[in-house]
Amino acid sequence: MIKNPELAQDFRYLIKQNGGMLAKGRLLGLQFAALFTDGLYQEISAHAIAMAEKLREAFTAKGYTYLAPNRTNQIFVIVPDAHLAKISEQFEYSYDQRIDAAHSCVRFCTGWATKEENVDALIRCVEKL
């Protein structure tokens, strides 16, 4: 905290100019440099997409439809509201939109840290509905 307003005026600029404050772009660039080294990004995203595909297959087998077809780690699935009530007792999802009086579109998203046993638990829950 700088109490003298005359010193405070250019303080941020002086810190940045003398290397005491890194630019956000540089920090983001370092993250991307690490991700794109030795196929790390492809490796961790492949797991996320594989887990999403496993969910997608189970949802399709259950007869659920999708807001739009995709092959990413995000699934926008249309589910009967009665099923969502049961699913929400054990699992989290993002509400997207109401489709009709009895159905809603929700988003399930997988990531590099998604555990297959958690995906399997969700699949078992859906199969019982």
Where are these regions (language model features)?
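Generic structural signal for hydrophobic core residues of well-folded globular domains
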Residues: L35-F36, V126-L129
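Active-site C-terminal subdomain of aminotransferase-like
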Residues: M1-Q74
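Conserved C-terminal alpha-helix-loop-beta "cap" of PLP-dependent enzymes
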Residues: E53-E127
